[in-house]
A protein has these predicted regions:
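Transmembrane helix-loop junctions in multipass membrane proteins, especially transporters and channels
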Residues: 22, 26-27, 57-58, 136
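Membrane-targeting alpha-helical segments
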Residues: 1-50
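Terminal membrane-proximal soluble interaction domains of membrane-associated proteins
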Residues: 64-140
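Flexible, solvent-exposed loop/hinge segments and secondary-structure transition points
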Residues: 37-74
């Protein structure tokens, strides 16, 4: 007969068995949690930035598009990266294309100050965490 105690026991036993069979299981779970927390933090910080931008518009704002060279390869990884960028206020994933033989994600930003810094922020923030979550902590 199903009960809450049986469910919790089965859940815990499942975690133990998985951790014994796959050594990287907990590291992968930690990488996924790291990505989710980073995404939530980015949404929060960017929301405040957009609120400030709307209430106190800066002079000489430069909206722009940056081309982010992709290390993510699978459709799932690319979709996750594009979705994370679009979920973050002030940025929007536009298109996936190629430039000089390299697959690129084109991203529109609300306030583009330094294109290189924006690309590094996306690659070091979102892309690196996605690769760790999908390919394992040793992927990068």
């Amino acid at each position: 007969e199903p009960s809450a105690g049986a469910f919790v026991t089965g859940l815990l036993l499942g975690f133990v068995v998985l951790s014994l069979l796959q050594r990287a299981y907990w590291r992968r779970i930690a990488a996924i949690a790291d990505f989710v927390l980073y995404l939530l933090w980015s949404i929060l910080v960017s929301s405040w930035g957009v609120i400030h931008y709307v209430l106190f518009p800066p002079k000489g704002v430069t909206r722009g598009i940056v081309a982010v060279p992709l290390e993510v390869q699978s459709r799932f990884e690319i979709a996750t990266l594009a979705s994370a960028i679009t979920l973050t206020p002030g940025t929007l994933s536009l298109e996936i294309g190629e430039s000089q033989g390299q697959r690129m994600l084109f991203v529109h930003t609300l306030n583009l100050i330094d294109p290189g810094a924006t690309v590094r922020e996306i690659k070091d923030g979102f892309e690196r965490r996605i690769l760790r979550a999908t390919r394992g902590p040793d992927a990068i």
